[in-house]
């Protein structure tokens, strides 16, 4: 079941077509790690996360951020089945990685901020509302294994 209107879907897919996954992904994950430093504990293998500049310049942060946004691209193709789309990732993050599901919500909010910064006037209140709905849906789907 989807709670996305045709307008939501159009706003999400239209903006997504303009997103540079590598750049936006690295920036989003980097900002999450800077603003919410406790999230760094999940990335011990990434090397130096000792300062904002170390985090933002870390190639492993950039690569994983791109991977996260690539996964988000799959969600955008499957807005009507976010829970199904993220079933395996929810299981991995819950059972194996023990990630607090609140972190998914935080990451989504950071992504919305990054999109707003990079897309200026195109990032209207309506587009923001649609993206906020989508990242909330993704966070819920990723957290579904926890419930």
UniProtKB/Swiss-Prot annotation:
One of its GO terms (molecular function) is peroxidase activity. Red blood cells. Pfam families: Globin (PF00042). Residues 3-147 form the Globin domain. The modification S-nitrosocysteine is found at residue 94. The modification N6-acetyllysine is found at residues 60, 83. GO terms for cellular component: blood microparticle; haptoglobin-hemoglobin complex; hemoglobin complex. Keywords: Acetylation, Heme, Iron, Metal-binding, Oxygen transport, Phosphoprotein, S-nitrosylation, Transport. Heme b binds at residues 64, 93. The modification Phosphothreonine is found at residue 13. The modification Phosphoserine is found at residues 45, 51, 53, 140, 144. InterPro entries: Globin, Globin-like_sf, Globin/Proto, Hemoglobin_b, Hemoglobin_oxygen_transport. GO terms for biological process: hydrogen peroxide catabolic process. Gamma chains make up the fetal hemoglobin F, in combination with alpha chains. Belongs to the globin family. Heterotetramer of two alpha chains and two gamma chains in fetal hemoglobin (Hb F). This is Hemoglobin subunit gamma-2.
């Amino acid at each position: 079941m989807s709670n996305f209107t045709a307008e939501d879907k159009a706003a999400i897919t239209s903006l997504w077509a303009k997103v540079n996954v590598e750049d936006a992904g690295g920036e989003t994950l980097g900002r999450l790690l800077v603003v919410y430093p406790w999230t760094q504990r999940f990335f011990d293998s990434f090397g130096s996360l000792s300062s904002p500049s170390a985090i933002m310049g870390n190639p492993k942060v950039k690569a994983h951020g791109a991977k996260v946004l690539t996964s988000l691209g799959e969600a955008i193709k499957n807005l009507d089945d976010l829970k199904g789309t993220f079933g395996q990732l929810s299981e991995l993050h819950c059972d194996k990685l023990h990630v607090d599901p609140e972190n998914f919500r935080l990451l989504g909010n950071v992504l919305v901020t990054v999109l707003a910064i990079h897309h200026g006037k195109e990032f209207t209140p309506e587009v923001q509302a649609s993206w906020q709905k989508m990242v909330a849906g993704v966070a819920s789907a990723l957290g579904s294994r926890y419930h």
